[in-house]
A protein has these predicted regions:
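DNA-contacting surface of Y-family translesion DNA polymerases
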Residues: 1-121
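Acidic, metal-coordinating catalytic segment for phosphate/diphosphate chemistry
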Residues: 95-187
């Protein structure tokens, strides 16, 4: 300690403490989320496409809402299917950054359509949004996104004021048990 203090002055003691692993500053864990996801395992395996699409729509809508609440955008959508024989298949697609339902739900449905090929009972479905970045939604210059964005903003405000299930797409209303909390803030 004395040698370090002679060489480095008042910082010598700090260097010695750090070399000994002595540090009384608080540990502040922080890790940026890399993805958000949700899955649903069915009580009874099913081949009911209406039910599966309803649940996937509700999941995508919920995750997109979580992205917007956390001021995040996703660039990768993954859909997962596990069949009754426990074979699990996933498919993903890279997309332009988005957090808007009208962009994400059709991609989820397309991936589901590509994945559901085996004609077996489905045990589990899931969705993951990854490659997350901070940011708001980018509007396209020549598309009519403004009305849709305003609709999403209004729906989000209603959800924040009256609860997450205050406004739902009709197709997703059967998915009554989709959890709706914000993984970015823990709310």
């Amino acid at each position: 300690v004395e040698l370090l203090q002679n060489v480095f002055g008042k910082h010598g003691r700090d260097i010695w403490k750090k070399a000994q692993g002595i540090d009384h500053s608080p540990v502040i864990p922080y890790q940026e989320r890399k993805s958000i996801s949700t899955e649903r395992t069915f009580e009874k395996d099913t081949t009911d496409h209406v039910k599966l699409k309803s649940i996937l729509t509700a999941m995508a809508e919920n995750l997109a809402y979580q992205l917007r609440r956390g001021n995040k955008l996703t660039a990768c959508v993954t859909v997962k299917i596990r069949y009754s024989d426990f074979q699990t298949y996933t498919q993903q697609r890279q997309i332009p950054y988005s957090a808007m339902d009208h962009n994400l739900i059709p991609i989820v449905m397309d991936l589901y359509k590509n994945l559901y090929q085996r004609r077996l009972l489905v045990r589990l479905v899931g969705i993951r949004f990854s490659n997350l970045v901070e940011g708001g939604q980018q509007m396209h210059l020549f598309e009519n996104d403004e009305k849709i964005a305003n609709l999403s903003i209004a729906m989000d405000k209603m959800r924040q004021r009256y609860g997450d299930r205050a406004v739902l797409r009709a197709v997703g209303m059967d998915a009554k048990t989709i959890g709706r909390w914000n993984p970015f803030t823990g709310e």
